[in-house]
Amino acid sequence: MQAGADAVGGRILTRAANPACPVRRCQLLDATYHVLRSQLEHLLDPDEADPWPRHHQHFGASLAVTAAGYRQVGGLPAVPYLEDEALFRALRRHDLRVRHSPQVRVYTSDRQQGRVAVGLSWQLREWAGLLQHGHEPLVDHPAQLISHWQTRRRLRELWRTTQAGAPVATQAAGLAAVGPVAAALLVPPPDLWRQVRQSASFGELWEWVEAQRQAQLASHGPWPHLPLRAAVALLRQEIARLMPAAT
């Protein structure tokens, strides 16, 4: 936080467990998937407040927030569970600087009976149930992630240009400017253009976009979910393609 972060999320690890345990193997593969996602996101839409190397976790005792940042977002959201995730979304909504630091680590139990309704123990039980029936967890297709992050970067540039006071001659010109981005996001151009002009932060704009496109993706999403192992392989391929040749 001395470097300017408003919040820091640490890596959450479990104590050494039997590597032959199917649930443990699934947990490690899921962690690999999410770290690779974070690396691909960095390559496509880098965040100066959260550079690579980074991870993906901001939960429970691993999440620290400055007093000023906590006050700015209105404190801990009143939700029945996953209040840490709700707090993270509030930080993002206000464009606060969140760092996922690999240098911060906390350790927790891998028990499958926890104290909260939805948490790590719940996730471990979900994986155990899937594996018991011979199924592999399904996750987002890397092609969808690539489109998602590339479009988010374009939208952020458009929002910043608009916030900087760049003149737009007519409503038609504004709609033309957001048209390609709106098409990629599956949202109506007039609605997107209105939100671009009205949103006080990019996080507020992106939260609106996410809410609008969830229903569209559920019914019109072009990319199916993939088994976890296949998604990890594709993420590795995409990262290798995007990394500088020297590496």
Listing of model-derived features with the role each one plays in the protein:
Residues 1-28:
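Conserved donor NDP-sugar-binding/catalytic core segment of glycosyltransferases
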Residues 27-55:
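Short, flexible, basic/aromatic active-site loop/helix in glycosyltransferases
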Residues 43, 57-74:
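Conserved nucleotide-sugar donor-binding
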Residues 62, 80, 98-99:
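A residue-level structural signature of the nucleotidyltransferase/glycosyltransferase Rossmann-like core
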Residues 81-87, 101:
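Acidic donor-binding loop at a coil-to-helix junction in glycosyltransferase catalytic cores
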Residues 90-92, 97:
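Hydrophobic residues within well-ordered alpha-helices
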Residues 102-118:
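Active-site donor/metal-binding and catalytic loop motifs
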Residues 129-247:
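Terminal low-complexity segments of carbohydrate-biosynthetic enzymes
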